[in-house]
């Protein structure tokens, strides 16, 4: 039995008519695929997570624990065929770091839900990379708590939306400790009739003096039917903090198209080249040859 649920909720509501406070989806009884526990320091762990062929809705839990002074790197390749929920929880102790790379590699008519959370102690660090390749609908909900002084969070998100697919992202970083930092960067392209919402929230809680948070999104719109909603939000209950947000939203201009055409590249090819750019950039900066090869190969298939 399935029912309508609300996900990706903004921490502070805005006008209902904007349609960004939360997202309704249909979800049903979830087949539990078990839990993974990852603590290996100084190593790269690779998880390939798929849904259950015999269930309409599947769910997987991943717990990642970085002990004091350790670094843990995890690659999650997410292969939904139907409806898949992946919950990933990060626990970062003092002077530790978790690097999490999530790669969407889902089927055409699938629905992928990502629920990612993290808690950082003093000088703990999180690096989150999400690569959303444009097949199936994807809903990503992230919540991170910078509890200790000097804790830091960095996110790089690359996406490609095409056909009538939906990309719905909610990311909230709460600054609790002093001199904490957050950097959120999202970039991608929308084609055909794709829809995308990006909600980025930086919340400076009382006691977070000396903290800095920045968020930036760059969106390339490549179709008359695309729908883009960008919702940057900075909340502040503390003095002596710095928060910045910005967004760049645009289309391919005539000069750029002329540049490509003068080199024998059609307008359609030019759009595809530009649409690939954000994901190709991330693929080449993750520092893992196997993952880079897989991402670029998948990108060739979807575009």
Q: How would you describe each model-predicted region?
A:
Residues 14, 279-282, 295, 299:
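Generic structural signal of hydrophobic/aromatic residues within well-ordered alpha-helices
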Residues 34-258, 262-265, 286, 292-303:
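Conserved beta-strand/loop scaffold segments within soluble protein domains that form the structured core
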């Amino acid at each position: 039995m399935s029912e309508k649920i609300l996900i990706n909720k903004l921490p502070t509501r805005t006008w209902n008519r904007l349609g960004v406070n939360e997202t309704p989806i249909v979800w049903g009884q979830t087949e539990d695929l078990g839990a993974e526990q990852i603590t290996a320091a100084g190593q790269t762990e690779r998880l390939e997570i798929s849904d259950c062929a015999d269930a309409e809705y599947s769910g997987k839990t991943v717990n990642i624990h970085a002990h004091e002074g350790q670094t843990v790197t995890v690659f999650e390749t997410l292969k939904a065929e139907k409806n898949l929920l992946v919950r990933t929880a990060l626990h970062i102790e003092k002077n530790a770091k978790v690097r999490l790379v999530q790669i969407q590699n889902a089927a055409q008519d699938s629905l992928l839900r990502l629920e990612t959370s993290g808690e950082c102690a003093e000088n703990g660090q999180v690096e989150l990379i999400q690569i959303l390749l444009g097949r199936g609908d994807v809903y990503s909900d992230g919540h991170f708590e910078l509890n200790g002084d000097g804790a830091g969070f960095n996110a790089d998100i690359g996406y490609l939306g095409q056909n009538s697919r939906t990309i719905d992202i909610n990311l909230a970083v709460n600054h609790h400790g002093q001199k904490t930092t957050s950097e959120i960067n999202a970039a991608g392209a929308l084609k055909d009739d794709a829809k995308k919402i990006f909600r980025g929230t930086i919340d400076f809680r009382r006691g977070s003096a000396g903290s800095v948070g920045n968020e930036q999104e760059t969106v390339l719109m490549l179709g008359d039917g695309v729908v883009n909603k960008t919702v940057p939000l900075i909340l502040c209950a503390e003095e002596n903090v710095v928060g910045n947000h910005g967004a760049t939203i645009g289309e391919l201009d005539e000069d750029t198209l002329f540049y490509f055409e003068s080199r024998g590249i059609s307008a359609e090819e030019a759009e595809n080249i530009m649409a690939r750019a954000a994901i190709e950039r991330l693929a080449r900066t993750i520092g893992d040859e196997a993952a880079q090869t897989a991402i670029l190969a998948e990108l060739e298939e979807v575009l």
